[in-house]
């Protein structure tokens, strides 16, 4: 299942990032004209659009751009996209934000990419696009979108293998993962064409386009492709030859798994979040409006970028359980206990742990996907934002709501919240929550992902009347918000019982603007809700942080090469602290010194004529060409290695640039604290939670009863 989906509906979300006031953030803005300033770019490719942003070295977002991307659905369950269109949209967004921000492209030191977990298919011979069907004549449609469900039969066959790698994806692969999609292609493509296919997860394809190098991310390979890092279940090379052979994909094992990106025999080939691949190659730098001075971070799935962009936020007041973790300044122990809820059409719940923790109905644990040596768990709700949309737009009073909200100049959700407040007085009830005390709503319209992992679950309502007024719509909306919150509690309770630590929920997405939903989430879970400054742009902001971390990673790796072989009394950690200090205080003298290795920050541009200008800043000249007419040129530099030597090899020493960057740049956040346990609303919600659980068991019981009877007729 997809990590996070773009929501472009009724919430009246603006294109610009939502930020706290300068007084709340207490972060100084860096001038784009500052010759010593450093800037970073983030790129986020969602289901319906590509986005990019520019941030400064204090984490201020200077510019944000978005461009829609198409998806094609010729028949049911077949949903495809174009990698060429996506790359062109990425280039447009990056060039736009650099121009609009006024930042000198020379000062952009790093770029990070996130995207949906969609399967990109290209030729292993020339990296041209290969059609993925159902129209096999249209090579432009070479991406099977994450939400494509064509591979149902193949998924069942894969799950029947019982392979040990399935243990790390909740016991079974989802039809939305990539191995089932690859198996479908084998069954439906001409044999010769399938033999020429090379496969990328979309985030890894974007970093390939940016660098010409085939480095893959642990995030994509581990979370969506059955890859096991070294030591997990005895894995020594990542991919399992036994697994691929058993499911009929032995072709993928040839040449050291080359068509999947290679194995861990090339230790430098798989990187974790924030680790540097290489500088931009010349072609990509021209297309993006950047320079070859800019380094590229390993890619990441979009929901995980939301985790990066939120969990290091500094709450405006103390949060119990988080104070202790503030002492961890050098590694990801400081992130433990911080649950990221990345919300949009659906919601993903991502949590880090030091040890592997298995939770029924929760994907993972995934090692090394966010930080080396740490494990990530991923729970999720398939219907949150889309659930609210569905209930509101299908109600008879929707037209009236739209008209009244427009007249009032507020979002539909804000208008409904005002109606609920009015109803408290009108009906003389204790609180807004009491308005739905006898309405029991269960909202899994499309099945349940977490924590019961039952695709057959469906929605049900107890207590509905024939009232079709706007007041009834408001109460139905309240019950849907309550359902989302109660299900979040259910997911959290299962994770806690399994051994996870959760002290706060770090929210992102447009749902953060819904004050009623935030209050219900806090009171149902009993946890503080932390809302960072970029609620609508947390994901693309997270990718920009990856770019910042990659820049620091590159500098440190370069310095480490210089120090190699020299005697030193310093420990690794001391050298790290001396070299890092803080992002704002890096020595420009050290940064500009090549020390026998050419830094991308110090490259001399060789151009055939005078440099182009954007806002009076120089850009490298490249031959005029469409942004992505062909992929052939990129393939010339394609390699399973980074270059002279691996930038990823041996870099991990118990420290983390990414966590330091997240702490320095994420900024402040506001908090919605839960009411006391003795508060009447908390007591009422506790009672309704028991009813919520009973509705789940009752629905499943009723299905079993009916299925038993139906089954007896066929005997």
UniProtKB/Swiss-Prot annotation:
Gene3D superfamilies: 1.20.58.2240, 3.30.420.40. Pathway: Carbohydrate metabolism; pentose and glucuronate interconversion. It catalyses: D-ribulose + ATP = D-ribulose 5-phosphate + ADP + H(+). Signal peptide: none annotated. It is an enzyme of class 2 (transferase). GO terms for cellular component: cytoplasm. Keywords: Kinase, Transferase. Residues 1-27 are annotated as: Disordered. GO terms for molecular function: D-ribulokinase activity. It comes from the Eukaryota. CDD domains: ASKHA_NBD_FGGY_D-RBK (cd07782). Its EC number is 2.7.1.47. Pfam families: FGGY_C, FGGY_N. GO terms for biological process: pentose metabolic process. Postulated to function in a metabolite repair mechanism by preventing toxic accumulation of free D-ribulose formed by non-specific phosphatase activities. Alternatively, may play a role in regulating D-ribulose 5-phosphate recycling in the pentose phosphate pathway. Belongs to the FGGY kinase family. This is D-ribulokinase YDR109C. It comes from Saccharomyces cerevisiae (strain ATCC 204508 / S288c).
């Amino acid at each position: 299942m997809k990590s996070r989906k773009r929501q472009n509906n009724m919430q009246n979300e603006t294109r610009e990032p939502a930020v706290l006031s300068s007084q709340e953030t207490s972060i100084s803005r860096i001038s784009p004209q500052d010759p010593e300033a450093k800037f970073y770019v983030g790129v986020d490719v969602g289901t319906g659009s590509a986005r990019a942003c520019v941030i400064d070295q204090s984490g201020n977002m200077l510019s944000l751009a978005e461009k829609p991307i198409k998806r094609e659905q010729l028949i049911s369950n077949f949903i495809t996209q174009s990698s060429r269109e996506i790359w062109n949209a990425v280039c447009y967004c990056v060039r736009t934000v650099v121009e609009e921000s006024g930042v000198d492209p020379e000062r952009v030191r790093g770029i990070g990419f996130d995207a949906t977990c969609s399967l990109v298919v290209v030729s292993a011979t020339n990296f041209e696009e290969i059609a993925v069907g159902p129209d096999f004549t249209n090579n432009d449609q070479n991406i099977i979108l994450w939400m494509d469900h064509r591979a149902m039969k193949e998924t069942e066959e894969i799950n029947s293998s019982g392979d040990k790698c399935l243990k790390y994806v909740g016991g079974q692969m989802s039809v939305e993962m990539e191995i089932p999609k690859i198996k479908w292609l084998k069954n439906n493509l001409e044999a010769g064409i399938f033999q020429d296919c090379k496969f990328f997860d979309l985030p890894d394809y974007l970093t390939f386009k940016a660098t010409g190098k085939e480095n893959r991310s642990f995030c994509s390979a581990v979370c969506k492709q059955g890859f096991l890092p070294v030591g997990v279940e005895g894995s020594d090379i990542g991919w399992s030859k036994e697994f691929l052979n058993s499911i009929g994909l032995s072709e993928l094992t040839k040449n050291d798994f080359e068509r999947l990106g290679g194995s861990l025999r090339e230790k430098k080939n798989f990187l974790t979040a924030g680790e540097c691949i290489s500088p931009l190659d010349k072609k990509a730098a021209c297309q993006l409006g950047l320079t070859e001075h800019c380094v590229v971070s390993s890619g990441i799935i979009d929901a995980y970028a939301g985790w990066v962009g939120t969990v290091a936020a500094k709450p405006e007041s103390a949060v119990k359980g988080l104070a202790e973790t503030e002492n961890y300044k050098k590694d990801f122990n400081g992130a433990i206990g911080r649950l990221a809820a990345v919300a949009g059409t659906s919601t993903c719940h991502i949590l880090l742990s030091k040890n592997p923790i298995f939770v029924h109905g929760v994907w993972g644990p995934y090692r090394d996907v966010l930080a080396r040596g740490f494990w990530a768990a991923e729970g999720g709700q398939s219907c949150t934002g889309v659930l609210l949309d569905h209930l509101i737009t299908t109600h008879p009073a929707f037209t009236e709501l739209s008209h009244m909200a427009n007249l009032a100049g507020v979002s539909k959700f804000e208008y409904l919240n005002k109606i609920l407040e009015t109803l408290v007085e009108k009906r003389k009830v204790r609180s807004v929550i009491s308005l739905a005390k006898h309405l029991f709503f269960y909202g899994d319209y499309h099945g349940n992902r977490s924590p019961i992992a039952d695709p057959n679950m469906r929605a049900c309502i107890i207590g509905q009347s024939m009232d079709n007024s706007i007041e009834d719509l408001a109460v139905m909306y309240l019950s849907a918000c309550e359902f989302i919150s109660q299900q979040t509690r259910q997911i959290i309770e299962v994770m806690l019982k399994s051994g996870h630590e959760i002290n706060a929920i770090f929210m992102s997405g447009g749902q953060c603007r819904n004050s009623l939903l935030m209050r219900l989430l806090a009171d149902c879970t009993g946890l503080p809700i932390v809302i960072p400054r970029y609620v609508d742009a947390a994901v693309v902001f997270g990718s920009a942080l990856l770019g910042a971390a990659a820049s620091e990673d590159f500098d440190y790796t370069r310095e480490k090469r210089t120090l190699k072989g020299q005697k030193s009394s310093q420990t690794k950690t001391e050298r790290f602290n001396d070299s890092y200090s803080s992002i704002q205080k890096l020595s420009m003298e050290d940064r500009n010194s090549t020390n026998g290795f050419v830094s991308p920050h110090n490259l001399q541009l060789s151009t055939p004529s005078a440099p182009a200008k954007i806002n009076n800043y120089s850009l490298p000249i490249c031959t005029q060409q469409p942004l992505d007419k062909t992929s052939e040129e990129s393939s010339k530099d394609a390699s399973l290695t980074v270059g002279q030597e691996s930038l990823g090899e041996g870099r991990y020493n118990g420290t983390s640039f990414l966590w330091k960057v997240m702490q320095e740049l994420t900024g402040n956040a506001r908090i919605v604290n839960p009411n006391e346990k003795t508060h009447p609303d908390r007591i009422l919600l506790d009672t309704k939670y028991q009813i919520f659980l009973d509705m789940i068991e009752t629905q499943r019981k009723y299905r079993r009863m009916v299925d038993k009877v139906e089954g007896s007729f066929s005997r």
